[in-house]
Amino acid sequence: METKQTKKEAVANLIKRIEHGEVSDEEIRGMMKIQVQKRLKWGYKPTHEQQLAQLVTFAQSLKGMEMAEEVDTLDAELYEIPLPFLHIMCGKTLKFSPGYFKDESTTLDESEVYMMDLYCERAQIKDGQSILDLGCGHGSLTLHVAQKYRGCKVTGITNSVSQKEFIMDQCKKLDLSNVEIILEDVTKFETEITYDRIFAVALIEHMKNYELFLKKVSTWIAQYGLLFVEHHCHKVFAYQYEPLDEDDWYTEYIFPSGTLVMSSSSILLYFQEDVSVVNHWTLSGKHPSLGFKQWLKRLDDNIDEVKEIFESFYGSKEKAMKFITYWRVFCIAHSQMYSTNNGEEWMLSQVLFKKK
């Protein structure tokens, strides 16, 4: 018991040091490399038989869970980040998921547009369709589709009041009359309306039971309609965001709630009770890795302005520094993780479904 307590205390002390900005970027990268190797050692099995059994067991375990856990304090803070901060860290469209980097010279703004164009191409968007964007955030994809396909009616769903207000304000500025934003939790949303195309980008990560989620969404897919899903993944194995061991500072610091899932690239193929896979792609982890690097650079280049924004928003210098450090470590750790083995471990999966 004494050893266990000592390890827990060591992690708690490390997190305090991180929060106080006492751990250098290089130390964070080094610690993340160790964490990544531990996760790979945990995830990879000696035989393919064991590897497949692990994934199938994990997929089956999800089927016994609720669709999603209640949004907790951390998630609420992530949804209600001060908008001026997002304008600094993210690109012009405020896309809060990875962009597509054609090469290292691609700018963050370009990467956001390239990725959303890829979504539209792979989801087979055509003018005149009805589009549903689940968990639309600040409307990057909703507004992109609405501008590019003026004949489309685009509906976005968000559970954030500030996000809805921002999107509707952008619609006025862009003279868009083909956008509707519904303020609702996706897991509680009900409608008899069906849509030609449905997007679920960076949403699956917040779900537990993919079967229940896809069953619900399938009722909103029109005849001959399609559902496009993008999610973060490891190429082979899946896991809950729970501490790997007692030395796991990363999960304790970045995802203390334990409500997220890191799925595998193929896991959604095991959930075809109500939808059928039409196509499936993966994108290298280089894309999110480069995106996190760009976020970090923009944050650091504007650090004084960020301090002012956070002090005003959170009410104290101490809390401002805590959140600045959190976002810096978030970017450093994930840039490191997604770059592992040249982007061939953690990556992005995109799946196109049709209704059964």
Swiss-Prot record:
Entry binding sites for S-adenosyl-L-homocysteine: F96, S97, G135, N159, Q163, D185, V186, V201
InterPro entries: SAM-dependent_MTases_sf (IPR029063)
Example GO biological process: methylation
Residues that, per the record, bind (S)-tetrahydropapaverine: E205
Annotated GO CC locations: cytoplasm
Chief subcellular location: cytoplasm
Active site, renumbered: C331
Described function: N-methyltransferase with a substrate preference for (+-)-pavine and (S)-reticuline, but also active with the protoberberines scoulerine and stylopine and, to a lesser extent, tetrahydropapaverine (THP) and tetrahydropalmatine. Is not active on (R)-reticuline, cryptopine, glaucine, codeine, canadaline, noscapine and berbamine.
Gene that encodes it: PavNMT
Family according to the record: Belongs to the CFA/CMAS family.
Name of protein: Pavine N-methyltransferase
Domain of life: Eukaryota
